[in-house]
Amino acid sequence: TSVDNHGTELTGRGRAQLGVTWNSPLGLGDVFAASGTYAFDPQASRAGALSYSVPLQAVQGLSVLAGANRSELEVDDGILRGFKLKGPASQAYAGADWKFINRPDLQVTSSARYIRESSRFEALGLVLSKQKYDVAEVGASVRHNDARWHGINLAQLSLRQSLRDRSADFDAINPTRDSRFNVVRLGLLRLQYLSRSQRLLFKFNGQYSNNSLPALEQFQVGGNDSVRGYAQGETLGDRGWYGALEYHVDAPGFGDVASPLRGVPWREVLELDVFADQARVFDVDGLEAPADLASVGMGATFRLRQWKNLELRVAAAKPTSALRPGDGRDVRVYARLGLTF
């Protein structure tokens, strides 16, 4: 469970989250997971997700899965009071994962999904956009433990293709979207250990498409998981990339000193970091110039693993690119408090 302020004024700045994972409920090595999010201050939005996976004994490393998620946004406050904006979105999927290489130093997993996704946007009781797509996705992921250079590599590659467009003909929000589309997505991560208490983290995420995409398929930039100097979903596009470089250090100068928290060394309690983010987003139609976003920041993470894995994270980020944040904030502060029972 956790609470944070990672949302926006439109979706609700504060968020309360609860997630449950049930391992082997049927005694088959299966996993059931459920989560819910309620956002508030000043607007209210809700989101929930369910998933279930079960391994197949006939093929080692093969499992089948199914799941669904839904989010609902309602805005009727501030300058938008009276417009009664609503924006539900949902996805349902089924598929399989196959971990066909599973060694201590290397794991490789292939995946396939059939997805039905939909979104709707309403104002004043009128439907402005109603998008429904059937999508197929195939992908592969790799985890490599680099013992020689003391690091960990992660990579993910996926290809998504629309199979069927069941959207309404009228679309006032995204009238140029294509009925057929292909999307390639790539994610890379390198965790490099410099010493027992210092490490570098490099992250990259990118998306490429030659099509004008529906909202649920567009590349999103901004927020705690992207360019942190900007609000969540600051800009969207058909193509884009995001990269970040982070330096982390555990309790610099006093890591081996016993803390007053049951004598746990400070290096297990306090972690400091600095980071730099960079991103660029494009639209295929070329009607708008590419958007460039960049920011720098610092953060601190406080952990008490013996107290229900309590974790408090605080970070601040400042935009360094020419693009002015939509909400006008020059410094953005993120906070999150989480517990695991």
Task: List PLM regions with ranges.
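Outer-membrane beta-barrel initiation region
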Residues: 1-64, 102
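Short loop/turn motifs that connect adjacent beta-strands in outer-membrane beta-barrel proteins
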Residues: 25-31, 57-63, 101-108, 145-154, ...
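Outer-membrane beta-barrel domain signature
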Residues: 5-9, 37-41, 79-85, 123-131, ...
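Transmembrane beta-barrel strands of outer-membrane/channel proteins
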Residues: 1-5, 32-38, 50, 66-72, ...
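C-terminal transmembrane beta-barrel domains of outer membrane proteins
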Residues: 172-341
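Transmembrane beta-barrel domains of bacterial outer-membrane proteins
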Residues: 31-39, 44-49, 77, 82, ...
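Transmembrane beta-strand segments of outer-membrane beta-barrel domains in Gram-negative
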Residues: 62-215, 281-284
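Transmembrane beta-barrel domains of outer membrane proteins
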Residues: 4, 21-23, 51-55, 67, ...
